[in-house]
Amino acid sequence: MGTRSVALVLLAAVLLQALLPASAAEGLVRIALKKRPIDENSRVAARLSGEEGARRLGLRGANSLGGGGGEGDIVALKNYMNAQYFGEIGVGTPPQKFTVIFDTGSSNLWVPSAKCYFSIACFFHSRYKSGQSSTYQKNGKPAAIQYGTGSIAGFFSEDSVTVGDLVVKDQEFIEATKEPGLTFMVAKFDGILGLGFQEISVGDAVPVWYKMVEQGLVSEPVFSFWFNRHSDEGEGGEIVFGGMDPSHYKGNHTYVPVSQKGYWQFEMGDVLIGGKTTGFCASGCSAIADSGTSLLAGPTAIITEINEKIGATGVVSQECKTVVSQYGQQILDLLLAETQPSKICSQVGLCTFDGKHGVSAGIKSVVDDEAGESNGLQSGPMCNACEMAVVWMQNQLAQNKTQDLILNYINQLCDKLPSPMGESSVDCGSLASMPEISFTIGGKKFALKPEEYILKVGEGAAAQCISGFTAMDIPPPRGPLWILGDVFMGAYHTVFDYGKMRVGFAKSA
């Protein structure tokens, strides 16, 4: 080939590169996310669904969620009612369009089926018609997924799935033929595309993301989320497959290794309120980066302290007040005598074993006050309240507070326990006086400002403000656990590095 021919080939290559979309040239696949503001209808639906979820979980027992070591326990708690960010995919050939949540906290892809005849929810959403796809392959294996505020059931099928410019071939997914209840009927999305690990996939189905990597569709085994928190609605952000967009973040990412496959789970350090330690996670907690959870969920003991500092409404726990009035001084004396904190509640006779467990059952009893809820000290509300009091008192003693001040403060916290329905209101005019809440990840503090963790609903005189924090107690061995949902991921650009098994955070641009 002559010099002239080589030059022409090079020129053609340059021109072709210039004509390619920027994302293709970068080896990135971009999915635009739409943002929907939280409205009053969604809030009402969330509360109703939350009540149903609490009743269902109460029958199983709060402690059973983590005790069995099952990988699907967090999925069983998920609440999609206040989801705000959605993207579009196609299923079949030609592609049938569906709006989905890209959810790093679950691993299956499901969409409503045209064979869904008896669930009203299906008729409010797009439905997959296998007969209209030339690449459909029958599977038929039954499937069901139970979420915290809803469930779906159906069967597996296989077809091509279009994500942006990519076509994932032979993808196993669930055709949902049953979507009972309120949750998915009022949802603004059709289905869910899970981006978690295969370990938590129902039916052991290979997740869409795995297939992208296996079929060589992405340049790097990495995907990243950017949520546009500056937009009330419309352009909500972007998910990038194959890497990250430098215009979406500032500075460098702080990476932490995935500590347990299944979820994008990692180890997290102390949580600080206004720069002061809460003590609860000083020796370490686990956390999950979860794009399918709108709020930021954590242990009741810390959420209660946050509620108190931001002036959030709460519920009064008589069990908590009883512990303070009848056992508070004794607990303080044992802490001052350097008794091992995990043994204190059993020593005062409120727990039947040494070691922490979840407190969800206790908080539920505050509202429901159902007979029999507190039977058995091991999982009773008095034991739960005692364990929280020990954590709170430890933290106050570390700040050299007097015993009277400590007991008064703990009594105040008993009035600020989070609602079991997960929503706490705050005064919109008080944001300037609210503290920063910081999370220690990879040795670095990631702070959330009030305007980042308070969600505004409505406009003008009708506007209401709700806390972006909600209580969720996961006992050992899975917990204590934080779920860093969209409230956190909106402030921090998040990278999910499948190749190096790590999660990275940097300030969003």
UniProtKB/Swiss-Prot annotation:
It is found in: Vacuole. Residues 85-506 form the Peptidase A1 domain. Keywords: Aspartyl protease, Disulfide bond, Glycoprotein, Hydrolase, Protease, Signal, Vacuole, Zymogen. Pfam families: Asp, SapB_1, SapB_2. One of its GO terms (molecular function) is aspartic-type endopeptidase activity. Glycans are attached at N252, N400. The keyword Protease applies. Residues 25-67 form a propeptide. Residues 315-420 form the Saposin B-type domain. PROSITE patterns: ASP_PROTEASE, PEPTIDASE_A1, SAP_B. SUPFAM superfamilies: Acid proteases, Saposin. Residues 1-24 form the signal peptide. Its EC number is 3.4.23.-. Gene3D superfamilies: Acid Proteases (2.40.70.10), Saposin-like (1.10.225.10). The active site is at D103, D290. GO terms for biological process: lipid metabolic process; proteolysis. Its main location: other. GO terms for cellular component: vacuole. Disulfide bonds join C116-C122, C281-C285, C320-C414, C345-C386, C351-C383, C428-C465. Belongs to the peptidase A1 family. Involved in the breakdown of propeptides of storage proteins in protein-storage vacuoles. PANTHER family: ASPARTIC PROTEINASE A1 (PTHR47966:SF76), BETA-SITE APP-CLEAVING ENZYME, ISOFORM A-RELATED (PTHR47966). This is Aspartic proteinase oryzasin-1. It comes from Oryza sativa subsp. japonica (Rice). The lineage of its organism: Eukaryota, Viridiplantae, Streptophyta, Embryophyta, Tracheophyta.
